Design a protein with these regions (language model features):
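A short alpha/beta connector and helix-capping loop motif
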Residues: 2-18
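Conserved acidic/glycine
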Residues: 16-18, 22-250
Length: 250
């Protein structure tokens, strides 16, 4: 609290914090029967920070557009961390019943969505458009530091391990999990190569490779290095210390 209070008092507008709220312990803040994002929001706002919450991805936008009475928004506002984790861990049918099913009118908003569609409703921290918008707002905020509170899913993209508490214990993904990960993110690796976990190399003329090279140059090269400059100091004239030498017999 002392550190964030200092940043707020000094109006450190170039300071941006990002808190990954993945709702599981060990490496993510969580309040099973409460809401860590709102808790952090209070702390930072009270210390003079600009707070940006990136909670719901853009796949929710069409559903929110139907929410003329604010009923879906009300459900979103009151859901606690433990429930949010379950909605990802237990699939679309569970989410339809336990989340949308709390209100008949809200349930009707997703009548045209399959259970798979509901499962794919994304969190804001995994939506590049929402993340970009948050960073854009953060870097253009003047007069105060900014914190981005991003809701994410533990084990995102790992298939059956996604949002599962046992994700913490997983050291290696199975071949099926790797295939699921590859297919989900459209990674150009065929089945024969998958077990070797090859590095992905972009073509030298691709926009991705050009971006990486340009960024490396801006950062000063591929490997960080500490540069030391030796400065030779001129020895003072011994006459300056004459009285000290004579007082100690030389």
């Amino acid at each position: 609290k002392g550190a964030i209070g200092l940043a707020g008092r000094e109006s450190l507008e170039n300071l941006i914090f990002v808190v990954n709220c993945n709702l599981q312990r060990l490496d993510g803040p969580v309040r099973g029967n409460h809401k860590i994002i709102q808790e952090l929001e209070r702390e930072f706002r009270g210390s003079g920070w600009n707070v940006i919450k990136v909670i719901w991805g853009r796949l929710w936008d069409p559903i929110l557009a139907r929410d003329k009475k604010g009923l879906l928004q009300e459900l979103m506002d009151k859901v606690v961390d433990g429930e949010l984790q379950n909605f990802k861990a237990k699939g679309g049918a569970y989410t339809r019943e336990k989340f949308f099913g709390q209100n008949k009118e809200v349930l009707e908003m997703v009548d045209d969505l399959s259970d798979e569609d509901i499962y794919k409703l994304n969190r804001g921290g995994h939506d590049p458009y929402k993340v970009y918008a948050a960073y854009h707002k953060a870097v253009n905020t003047k007069g105060a530091p900014t914190v981005i509170l991003a809701l994410t899913t533990k084990g995102y993209g790992t298939g059956s391990r996604e949002a599962d508490n046992t994700t913490h214990q997983v050291k290696k993904l199975t071949i099926e999990n790797l295939k699921s990960f590859r297919d989900r993110f459209d990674i150009p690796v065929n089945d024969d190569e998958l077990e070797k976990l090859p590095y992905i190399k972009f073509d030298s003329s691709s926009k991705e490779q050009k971006y990486l090279m340009e960024t490396r140059q801006k950062l000063g090269g591929f490997l960080p290095a500490r540069k030391f400059q030796d400065i030779a100091l001129k020895k003072p004239d011994s006459e300056l210390f004459g009285k000290y030498f004579s007082g100690s017999d030389g």
